[in-house]
A protein has these predicted regions:
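Phosphate/nucleotide-binding beta-alpha loop and adjacent structural elements of enzyme active sites
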Residues: 2-323
Length: 323
């Protein structure tokens, strides 16, 4: 007859095996949850809408007049086929051929970043063949957070730069990544905004302005797209490193991202000009399942680095004691 004492002795002698078995079981349960558990999980979380097709049933997938004017006016969903087609056909510029050398002002400077690349290499274990997005790519060389990754680690990605002169210089670099002369939308739909060209980096200052206001040469109207729309147009939902520098609008951009649809491992966010402040970014990213790795503070950068907390869904308590 099995006694409580014999059961206790069995547990003690086979503790390691039992812990391993329980751990594997829990991991499998988490990795392949039942449809009921998925349904219950969605019910317990506060529902956030991201302007996606699945949220607006009845909205036609195909429109008669698929133009950027239509997309802006109707605030098309981030994943609407019309919007993705516009980005793909009219805004995504192909990488320079691999046999065309880079055209750099300072070719001997391997890493022009202000420390962001060091964080990427450390946290991603010198990952090769990765994929990045750099918003605020400037001229593609000066203080670039991705040039080293492209040159030395065989990465590729998306370089987003709305400021006309900076983009013109970027296009001359022969980078081996896709480029867009656009801004990331501050809304969950495409918008056209006015852009201040007088500052070195440039920044969004408001809505689209009239031609008379453009004639002074200080402003430009720029088309913005949600980050998720750009990724879908490129056929990408996995990003190893996202560098976000949009002169104060970083938190607004982050809030447009449907985090349940994309997988972004590492993010560097400039926080210096964000009106809501550093801790607002940290708190928001924590809610999205990211860990604050640390800050980069130099005369040229004020970034906070986040890494996805891949252990968050695997945590559990194991208690082993005699009652």
């Amino acid at each position: 007859m099995t006694t409580p004492r014999s059961i206790r002795l069995f547990v003690i002698r086979h503790r390691s095996l039992l812990i391993f078995t329980v751990s594997i079981g829990l991991i499998l349960m988490i990795a392949w949850p039942s449809s009921d558990s998925r349904h219950n999980s969605k019910q317990t979380k506060k529902k956030v809408l991201y302007n996606l097709m699945e949220e607006t049933k009845g909205m036609p997938k195909h429109v008669k007049d698929c133009t950027i004017e239509y997309a802006n006016a109707h605030k098309l969903q981030q994943d609407h086929p019309c919007l993705l087609d516009i980005i793909r056909r009219q805004h995504l510029n192909k990488p320079s051929p691999s046999d065309v050398p880079l055209f750099l002002d300072y070719p001997n400077v391997k890493d022009p970043s202000a420390g962001q690349v060091t964080a990427v290499l450390r946290l991603l274990r010198n990952l090769t063949n990765g994929f990045f997005i750099e918003s605020g790519a400037a001229d593609g060389e000066s203080f670039s957070n991705t040039l080293f990754l492209e040159r030395e680690m065989n990465w590729t990605g998306l370089l987003v730069e709305p400021e006309p002169k900076s983009f013109q210089n970027l296009a001359k670099r022969n980078r081996k990544s896709w480029t867009l002369q656009n801004c990331l939308s501050l809304e969950k739909y495409p918008t056209e905004v006015s852009f201040d060209k007088t500052e070195i980096t440039g920044k969004i200052i408001g809505s689209k302005v009239s031609q008379s206001e453009l004639d002074n040469g200080k402003l430009a109207n720029v088309q913005c797209f949600p980050l998720y729309s750009i990724l879908l147009a490129h056929g990408q939902n996995w990003v190893d490193f996202f560098s976000l520098d949009v002169e104060g609008h970083e938190l607004q951009v982050l809030k447009t991202i449907p985090w349940h649809k994309v997988n972004i491992t590492l993010i560097a966010v400039e926080w210096e000009h964000v009106e809501e402040g550093y801790y607002a970014i940290v708190d928001y990213m924590k809610e999205q399942g990211y860990v604050n790795f640390g800050r980069i503070a130099t005369p040229y950068a004020r970034d906070v680095v986040f890494i996805k907390d891949f252990l968050d869904d695997l945590r559990f308590d194991y208690v082993d004691y005699d009652e």
